[in-house]
Amino acid sequence: MLEVIKAIEAEQVRNDLPEFHVGDTVKVHQKIKEGTRERVQIFEGTVLKRQNGGARETFTVRRVAYNVAVEKTFPVNSPLIEKIQVVRKGKVRRAKLYYLRDRVGKAAKVKERI
């Protein structure tokens, strides 16, 4: 039974997305359907965490706009994600960057990896 589940999950995993890590600044191009129209919405922010693995993998992106913090969680293998662009590579020592939620301004910056 386990082999069947792994085989199905292996078919659903996307290979066309770039490699990105926690701390990276990414642009997520997401398809949004409004009535009959379909458009692409871009959400740019810092990757706070990556969870699970395989077909069920998700990642959370945080961005602060007009002094309001917004966090969105995306499934990596979702067909609604058109593409992911890595804008900046971040250098962090943690797998989950929850401490950034308490930081404001320059204190919430992540060092750049060269």
Swiss-Prot record:
Assigned keywords, A-Z: Ribonucleoprotein, Ribosomal protein
InterPro entries cross-referenced by the UniProt entry: Ribosomal_bL19, Ribosomal_bL19_CS, Ribosomal_bL19_sf, Translation_prot_SH3-like_sf
Listed transmembrane segments: none
Gene3D superfamilies to which the protein is assigned, alphabetical: 2.30.30.790
Annotated Gene Ontology cellular component terms: cytosolic large ribosomal subunit
A GO term, aspect molecular function: structural constituent of ribosome
One BP annotation, GO: translation
HAMAP family: Ribosomal_bL19
Function statement: This protein is located at the 30S-50S ribosomal subunit interface and may play a role in the structure and function of the aminoacyl-tRNA binding site.
Family listed: Belongs to the bacterial ribosomal protein bL19 family.
Name of the molecule in the record: Large ribosomal subunit protein bL19
Protein encoded by which gene: rplS
